[in-house]
């Protein structure tokens, strides 16, 4: 439980790399950037996850629990779908790491369209839809520009964490850097957040 959000709060932000869809089963890098507030990068963790697979939850749990970074206070996710429709089980990550999760989203997700795509392309669509819905309804923080979902943390504290960990962009710096690093690994060059 976070009593007070300090300026130097330790967070880890996860994002995957840009990828060209070739075939289900290919791998994409997942990068976690560990930061103290919005200024100091403390470290980086990586895992490989499967396009349209079901391994991102295990990858995040392993990256957090097996790392040397034992003073983390919050996990930041850039959405809950990675490598296509590899969907994070946010409730399981919260339970197994003991850390609150803040999912940050730039565009409000169209859940109906996502459900239709899942039904069309996946035999296990019911389970994937359940995972999508388990994060709750996105809350609008900056009208039309930034939304979030909070698991294991109050709305007020989640918004404070987002503000404190953001620097020159709308999203927390750990997420911005994770995106740049992951994209550079996958394509040879970083892409814009």
From Swiss-Prot:
Which positions carry the signal peptide feature in this UniProt record? none
UniProt cross-references to InterPro entries, sorted A to Z: Endo_dU (IPR002802)
Transmembrane domains' residue ranges: none
UniProt similarity note: Belongs to the UPF0215 family.
HAMAP family assigned to the protein according to its UniProt record, in alphabetical order: UPF0215
Q: Which NCBIfam families match?
A: PRK00766.1 (NF001977)
- Full protein name: UPF0215 protein PYRAB00790
């Amino acid at each position: 439980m976070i009593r007070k959000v300090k300026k130097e709060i330790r967070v880890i932000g996860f994002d995957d790399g840009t990828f060209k869809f070739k075939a289900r089963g290919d791998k994409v890098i997942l990068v976690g950037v560990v930061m103290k507030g919005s200024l100091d990068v403390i470290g980086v963790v990586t895992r490989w996850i499967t396009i349209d697979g079901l391994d991102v939850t295990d990858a995040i749990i392993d990256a957090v629990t097996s790392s040397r970074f034992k003073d983390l206070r919050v996990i930041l996710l850039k959405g809950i779908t990675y490598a296509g429709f590899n969907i994070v089980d946010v409730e399981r990550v919260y339970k197994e790491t003991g850390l609150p999760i803040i999912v940050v989203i730039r565009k409000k997700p169209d859940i109906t369209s996502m459900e239709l795509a899942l039904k069309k392309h996946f035999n296990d669509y019911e389970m994937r839809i359940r995972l999508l819905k388990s994060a709750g309804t996105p809350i609008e923080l900056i009208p039309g520009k930034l939304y979030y979902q909070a698991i294991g943390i109050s709305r007020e504290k989640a918004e404070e964490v987002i503000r404190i960990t953001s620097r020159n962009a709308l999203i927390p710096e750990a997420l911005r850097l994770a995106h740049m690093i992951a994209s550079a690994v996958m394509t040879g060059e970083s892409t814009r957040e």
